[in-house]
């Protein structure tokens, strides 16, 4: 008997001037299916809808000069207030290169502690500092590089958090054996055929001996991690 999910487990409210960018995850794949099942809920709040000038602009020149434009305080503030008003105990997250760099253990902590998240997706040269100082609870970065906006970073976080929610991914074991779950990279995986272009699947995987397979996979994970991400080994041991 299939389990039914009668209430949303987590809600994401997204502040963005480009909500259409999110159709890639809301309409397709595992996240799209989770939305249809009502396991997760995603809403959008466009700052342009809160702009009070006839051009619906949401940016302005920075005080003190400098290149580019900043997202203005008022449209962002009003969008955040509406996003927060939809539920209680909301956490407001700003996606920024200045934020704490996101790791798998942070994703797990966010899922446990935060059930209602507002993501602020910046654009241009960033947002008015007063929003960060007075409206943002946490700043997160997905890596030490610059994107044109926070939308892709928000999608990364939504995907990473959502896939840990019961019912989003059918096979629990797939999550338990993912890369980084135990601070190790994944082991090599193979599918049919057994031999292609003179390349064979390792014999141990065809043996049916589950203990030997488990040991082989552990050795491969350790070896791959040591070669490609030795920092993970040093952190753990």
Curated annotation (Swiss-Prot):
Molecular function (Gene Ontology), one example: tRNA (guanine(37)-N1)-methyltransferase activity
UniProt main location, coarse: cytoplasm
Catalytic activity: guanosine(37) in tRNA + S-adenosyl-L-methionine = N(1)-methylguanosine(37) in tRNA + S-adenosyl-L-homocysteine + H(+)
GO biological process: tRNA N1-guanine methylation
UniProt KW Amino-acid biosynthesis keyword: no
InterPro entries recorded: Alpha/beta_knot_MTases (IPR029028), tRNA_m1G_MeTrfase_C_sf (IPR023148), tRNA_m1G_MeTrfase_TrmD (IPR002649), tRNA_m1G_MTases_N (IPR029026), tRNA_MeTrfase_TRMD/TRM10 (IPR016009)
Top enzyme class: transferase
Location of this chain's protein in the cell: Cytoplasm
EC number: 2.1.1.228
Keywords: Cytoplasm, Methyltransferase, S-adenosyl-L-methionine, Transferase, tRNA processing
Entry keyword annotation includes Signal: no
GO cellular component, one term: cytosol
One Pfam family this sequence matches: tRNA_m1G_MT
Binding residue positions for S-adenosyl-L-methionine: 122, 142-147
Its biological purpose: Specifically methylates guanosine-37 in various tRNAs.
Family label: Belongs to the RNA methyltransferase TrmD family.
Assembly and binders: Homodimer.
NCBIfam families cross-referenced by the UniProt entry: PRK00026.1 (NF000648), trmD (TIGR00088)
Protein name as it appears in the record: tRNA (guanine-N(1)-)-methyltransferase
Lineage start: Bacteria, Pseudomonadati, Pseudomonadota, Gammaproteobacteria, Enterobacterales
């Amino acid at each position: 008997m299939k389990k039914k999910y009668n209430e949303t487990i987590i809600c994401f409210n997204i502040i963005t001037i480009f909500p259409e960018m999110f159709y890639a995850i809301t309409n397709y794949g595992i996240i799209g299916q989770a939305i249809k099942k009502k396991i997760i809920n995603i809403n959008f709040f466009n700052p342009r809808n809160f702009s009070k000038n006839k051009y619906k602009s949401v940016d302005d020149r920075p005080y003190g000069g400098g290149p580019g434009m900043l997202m203005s305080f008022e449209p962002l503030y009003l969008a955040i207030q509406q996003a927060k008003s939809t539920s209680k105990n909301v956490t407001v997250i700003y996606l920024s290169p200045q934020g704490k760099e996101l790791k798998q253990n942070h994703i797990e902590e966010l899922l446990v502690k935060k059930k209602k998240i507002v993501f602020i997706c910046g654009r241009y040269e960033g947002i008015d500092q007063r929003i960060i100082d007075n409206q943002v609870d946490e700043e997160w970065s997905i890596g030490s590089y610059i994107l044109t906006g926070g939308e892709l970073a928000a999608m990364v976080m939504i995907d990473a958090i959502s896939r840990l929610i019961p019912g989003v991914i059918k096979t629990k074991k797939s999550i338990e054996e993912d890369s980084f779950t135990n601070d190790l990279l994944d082991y090599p995986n193979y599918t049919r055929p057994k031999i292609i272009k003179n390349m064979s699947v390792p014999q141990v995987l065809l043996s049916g001996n589950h203990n030997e397979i488990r040991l082989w996979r552990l050795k491969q994970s350790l070896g791959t991690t040591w070669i490609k991400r030795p920092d993970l080994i040093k952190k753990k041991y």
